[in-house]
Amino acid sequence: LASKSSTRLAALTVAAVCSAASTIVLTSPAHADSVRVHDIQGSTRLSPYAGEQVTDVAGIVTGVRGYGSSRGFWIQDPQPDADPATSEGVFVFTGSTPKGVAVGDAVTVSGTVSEYVPGGTSSGNQSLTEITRPVFTVVSSGNEVPAATAVSARTVPRAYAPEGDEAANGSVNGLTLRPAKYALDHYESLEGMNVRVADARVVGASDPYTELWVTVKPWENANRRGGTVYGSYDSQNTGRLQIQSLGKPADFPDANVGDTLAGTTAGPLDYNQYGGYTLVASEIGALESGGLERESTRRQSSRELAVATYNVENLDPSDETFAAHADAIVHNLASPDIVSLEEIQDNDGATNDGTVAADATVGKLIDAIVAAGGPRYDWRGIDPVDGEDGGQPGGNIRQVFLFNPERVSFTDRGTGDATTATGVTKVRGKAALTHSPGRVDPANPAWEDSRKPLAGEFVFRGRTVLVIANHFSSKGGDQSLSAQYQPPARGSETQRHLQAKAVNTFVKDVLSTQKNADVVALGDINDFEFSRTTRLLEDDGALWSAVKSLPRSERYSYVYQGNSQVLDQILVSPSIRWGGRLSYDSVHVNAEFHDQISDHDPQVLRFRP
């Protein structure tokens, strides 16, 4: 991804900004003036009272949120009905910091029932039932808060979500909740209620927005480092739950994957655009370390070529992470011979003044690598056209090759630039690039507002290796796993499919020139190893994703919403797959840690050309 943080509006916005949101208004018959919370919630995702005024809705205050854009309080009816599909809690949206109300107050609330869609209706998100424009009366104070309902491996179903209603474009909104059958229905049946998890293992590290992810099913698609692997579109991992806090940000734990929130973590169950169902904790369990350590890969032998890909997340000269990135490259990656860097920004970072050169950015990293005890890398890259390659505005992110000249040489040929396509020619009977470095098919519409592939020709021990550095378009705009549309739409795939076809076509051109050419296509593919994007890259056996040489439980380079998943890949031509004695390592140094310097883990491939 170009930047995870760039998709966030501000810290602790929770259910999000009203101007970016929408409400769903339904037409329904008149109801009696006095209703209970479970009547408002109903047995589907949409309230039968949406758009109506309700009067004197009774409940006990279970939580008060006085920060962010979604301020208000939760109430819960202490006298539940017998229907497991109807929640007994609801959020009362005040818009400003609630005054005159505290946890334990018995209140009556009058206002308008609303279905608020975090992120707006175009996001495809589910809605959150709220009472808006409230007038409330405190009847008494100091009451016992309704006991928190346990969310556990026993209560959360194995199946993730029902199939959406075809007549409603795949929406689940109108379907009667089946909380004993589907995980999303189970969570919806608890929306707004006081819930708890016990001894929950962390599967998504604490982030700058004081959020983390836990699982109530620690065995579910588990990996050896404590995470939960997303290994197919049907492996959504139902035990995942986001945790936020009603306390001070300074009191939020700095948790890594594999840690445990020992004891009870409890609070109201919310829904927001940055993770769906979220336990907004008034009580957080004690942090117990799982002892997670950063990995280091082995050094390549003298006869092995080590090639790596590393997304350094919007690196520009003003960043304070150069020494840490250098240390990772030297000590955790064992100084690979060739490194494809993604998200190298221009010399003035996000300042949008027409600068496109990145020599200062790359030079600072090379100097830091030397200071860390590594080799003095040489480098190659092509400056993009200003503002044409996506990413953070003004940053002009691009891919860059680092290479160790004591181990490999770079073949410079032609005068490649941002708009000139490199091609395939034959030199001394072998496949070669017409421009090295050069860009692959840069005029192809597949690369609109996205990074164009960078191709380079290297020589190791007399053998030519062609390397293509990629950074495919991001997943921005895809519907979330917890969306109202099931299965969710992945609209961003369309562009990546075109990009994959373009790279695959180029590799086929190489192989038609030299059948046994050594080709490596690597980078931030922004898609899974089981995705159609990857299958298109691999079409007709031109390439093979080497991450699939790892056990399924070890295939991940990124952690998103508690799912450990593959985004970064190294793909190889048949000569390397079958004859290169390849060794692959996803080196976990970032994605699982709260103090990460990038949101991606680097990948290393060793082989014998």
Can you name each region flagged by the protein language model?
Residues 278-609:
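Divalent cation-coordinating acidic motifs and surrounding scaffolds
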Residues 33-338, 419-423, 429-452, 496, ...:
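Extended non-catalytic accessory segments flanking core domains
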Residues 27, 38-41, 345, 559-561:
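Generic, ordered loop/turn and secondary-structure boundary motif
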Residues 4, 16-18, 32, 253, ...:
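Short, functionally important structural connectors and interaction interfaces within domains
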Residues 1-32:
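Secretory targeting and sorting signals
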